[in-house]
Structure formats: structure tokens, C-alpha cells
UniProtKB/Swiss-Prot annotation:
GO biological process: translation
CDD domains noted in UniProt: bS6
Highest taxon of source: Bacteria
Reported function: Binds together with bS18 to 16S ribosomal RNA.
Gene Ontology MF: a single term: structural constituent of ribosome
Chain positions covered by the region annotation Disordered: 110-142
Organism field: Helicobacter pylori (strain HPAG1)
Family statement: Belongs to the bacterial ribosomal protein bS6 family.
Amino acid composition bias (Basic and acidic residues), ranges on this chain: 110-133
InterPro entries in the cross-refs: Ribosomal_bS6, Ribosomal_bS6_CS, Ribosomal_bS6_sf, Ribosomal_S6_plastid/chlpt, Transl_elong_EF1B/ribsomal_bS6
Name of the molecule in the record: Small ribosomal subunit protein bS6
Species classification: Bacteria, Pseudomonadati, Campylobacterota, Epsilonproteobacteria, Campylobacterales
């Protein structure tokens, strides 16, 4: 399975029940095709960067999931034929570095410290420890 992120923007004219229904529909598309949703972010109503189909606002939803590449075409097809979807994007994370970034995004969405941040903090701690040692050696030699 590959790592993906999808975001879609729904029309602002939908009522809460319709929004929930659309979100559940797309989540089911992923899971029915043996995908696994790791986490999702319900970002709510936001201003659009530019007007889309005469709308200045839209309802944003993001999901991070693992799935087989074959189901992505079906997901995109279903986005395209739904007139309530203003915009959508599906991003595939391929390289080791991209997959690490995907995990960091999932951790952030789940409010956990990310793997990448832990690595960075470890490196930063080691680096500052070496600087302290170098400074103490430098001050002793004077």
C-alpha cells in the first residue's frame, strides 16, 4: 500500500447533514477499496484564495490514508462527478523522505510528537552538547 493525502472543498451552501454525508461517502470509498485512513482533519468553512464557481468560501476536509494505487482513479472520478465538490487534490508520498513527512503530518494531525521532530531534537541536543564541550575545552586552554 502507498501513502496518500487527499483534500477536498465542498460548496458552502450545503447544510451540516449534507457535509457529514459527503465526508462519510468519501471515507467509505477509501475503506471499501481496502484503504486505511490513518487520520483526518475537518478544517471547516474557510475563505477560498480565489472565487470558484461563484463561491468565495468552501468547506475543507483532509484525510491521510494508505491504499493501493488502483483505487485512486476511482476516488478522483467520484470527486469529479460530484457537483458539490469545488476542488480536490490527491497527493502520493513515494520516497523515503516523503513517507517520513507523511508520518509527521499524521502525527501532527493526531497531536503526537512526530518522528522527524524527535530526530531533529536528538540531533539538536547532541549538537548543543558538543558545542558546550568545545566551549569548555576552549576556556580551559586559555
Amino acid at each position: 500500500m502507498r501513502h496518500y493525502e487527499t483534500m477536498f472543498i465542498l460548496k458552502p451552501t450545503l447544510v451540516e447533514e449534507e457535509i457529514k454525508s459527503k465526508i462519510e461517502f468519501y471515507k467509505e470509498v477509501i475503506t471499501k477499496h481496502h484503504g486505511v485512513i490513518e487520520t483526518s482533519l475537518d478544517m471547516g468553512m474557510r475563505n477560498l484564495a480565489y472565487e470558484i464557481k461563484k463561491h468565495k468560501r468552501g468547506y475543507y476536509y483532509v484525510a491521510y490514508f494508505k491504499a493501493e494505487p488502483s483505487m485512486i482513479l476511482e476516488l478522483e472520478r467520484l470527486y469529479r462527478i460530484n457537483e458539490d465538490v469545488l476542488r480536490f487534490i490527491v497527493i502520493k508520498y513515494e520516497s523515503k523522505k516523503e513517507v517520513e513527512a507523511w508520518h509527521a503530518l499524521v502525527d501532527r494531525a493526531n497531536k503526537k510528537p512526530s518522528h522527524a521532530k524527535e530526530k531533529h531534537e536528538k540531533t539538536e541536543h547532541t549538537h548543543s552538547h558538543h558545542l558546550e564541550e568545545a566551549e569548555s575545552v576552549g576556556s580551559h586552554s586559555e
